[in-house]
Amino acid sequence: MSSRKSTASSLLLRQYRELTDPKKAIPSFHIELEDDSNIFTWNIGVMVLNEDSIYHGGFFKAQMRFPEDFPFSPPQFRFTPAIYHPNVYRDGRLCISILHQSGDPMTDEPDAETWSPVQTVESVLISIVSLLEDPNINSPANVDAAVDYRKNPEQYKQRVKMEVERSKQDIPKGFIMPTSESAYISQSKLDEPESNKDMADNFWYDSDLDDDENGSVILQDDDYDDGNNHIPFEDDDVYNYNDNDDDDERIEFEDDDDDDDDSIDNDSVMDRKQPHKAEDESEDVEDVERVSKKI
């Protein structure tokens, strides 16, 4: 295997895994390999999930073939069987600028709209779904379909509805057609920043404790109690601040349910008071003796 083919194979394998990963896959496409030993030929089911589209509900089979120098050359895309669409040839080949090689003298398409190595399989498939819903009638591949689309829209819609119903027989056994709601949820998960997911699980995110730029804990003004720098806690929690020598400073909360640990030992208090009581009694005796002598 040549180095270029090996590069293409590795790239396609990675993109195939991403597009078939349940967590990352786009609901509009069902993708399988024609042969498990050949990464260069993909069988694809194209679905339009927009409920307002006349193509909604269809499962349009297609095949994608990749050249050995991919991504430097574009893949080929063909609907199998062909569908009635202004930009689909009667043999099923798709006429779309993103799959045309740049610099082709047979077309007048600007290079910005043609194939480039930065394109991916995903970007191509998304462009195809967009073209299904919004045909380019200025460059038709099927003239009859283009005329119907422009001059006989109702006739065109009826023809497409027939295509949609016919395509349903190609839905793989056991495959559940996605809905527009599932597509929205899937896209929302992809768009959700990882920081937001982590933030939802972060205890301190909704706390009154903030971090400064150095990661140290800062106490807000309303955290202090009458100027004593004491943070009140409920349920007699004990607030300990450990000023360790290392860079990690921790705040520890200890729930002490044993009253003996938090309460004052009455016996020890009485013991501390006993000397004062003895001194008071001694002074009283001396006063009595002095009075007796005077009498």
UniProtKB/Swiss-Prot annotation:
Pfam families: UQ_con. Residues 185-295 are annotated as: Disordered. Residues 207-226, 234-265 have a biased composition (Acidic residues). It comes from the Eukaryota. Its main location: cytoplasm. Transmembrane segments: none annotated. It is found in: Cytoplasm; Nucleus. Its EC number is 2.3.2.23. The modification Phosphoserine is found at residues 186, 282, 292. It catalyses: S-ubiquitinyl-[E1 ubiquitin-activating enzyme]-L-cysteine + [E2 ubiquitin-conjugating enzyme]-L-cysteine = [E1 ubiquitin-activating enzyme]-L-cysteine + S-ubiquitinyl-[E2 ubiquitin-conjugating enzyme]-L-cysteine. InterPro entries: Ub_conjugating_enzyme, UBQ-conjugat_E2_core, UBQ-conjugating_AS, UBQ-conjugating_enzyme/RWD. Residues 189-200, 269-279 have a biased composition (Basic and acidic residues). Residues 7-169 form the UBC core domain. It is an enzyme of class 2 (transferase). The active site is at 95 (glycyl thioester intermediate). Belongs to the ubiquitin-conjugating enzyme family. The acidic C-terminal extension is essential for the cell cycle function. Present with 8170 molecules/cell in log phase SD medium. Catalyzes the covalent attachment of ubiquitin to other proteins. Capable, in vitro, to ubiquitinate histone H2A. Interacts with CDC53. Component of the E3 ubiquitin ligase complexes SCF with CDC53, SKP1/CBF3D, HRT1 and some F-box proteins like MET30 and CDC4. This is Ubiquitin-conjugating enzyme E2-34 kDa.
